[in-house]
């Protein structure tokens, strides 16, 4: 809602202490489905002087390409942002698919748009690493660092292809 979004922006402004504590106004965009688990992105804005009236959410579209289109339109209006994919190790291969959302081959336009809007990726957090997996990096002695096979005592059925940055 506008009220919750306004409060998010206000909280970022109130907590900001130049040179001591940096805050960002942002939110989490989730586009998970039963087939595409754990598709989370943190969307962070540069400054709070120019902000969208409301964030782009799964109510607008669950397709991350829709998020990127929206971010590009916001950028044309002087509103800078970036999306940071995270928890890709739990995406069941959907975070870094070799096709677009609709199954079409990735082309240069897709790659450019994704890089423009998602220049960073979260590598490691409490839910495990999203860097690589021993099945993907057989010669990397550190590939088994923080592999997280369980989620809430349930086996994590996320396959390595498409779930890790170094795929």
Role assignments for model-derived ranges:
Residues 1-167:
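Extended, charged catalytic domains and RNA/DNA-binding interfaces, predominantly
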